[in-house]
């Protein structure tokens, strides 16, 4: 089994993504509100040196963007490619800036979930 972790910056597609996953028989997602380190520092820094550094990456950030969503899914190995396809379809592709990232980790033990 795998734990699929997705950091979704393009939060306006969250509902569509969940529906697409459900259409593929992928259920049981846990959704957490999250904020990236650079975004947090940019919005809260009073330090002039930090502000200078963060100003150089300002073009990469959208300070008006709401929080990201972190989506956690425990999947069977064979469901991973379908889940990633759903993410790519709904987001328009993770290769676009400020969309999100997805990765998996192995799950060696789990209790309390039925597949």
Tell where the protein language model's regions lie, with residue ranges.
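Positively charged, small/polar-rich N-terminal and surface patches that mediate targeting and assembly
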Residues: 1-115
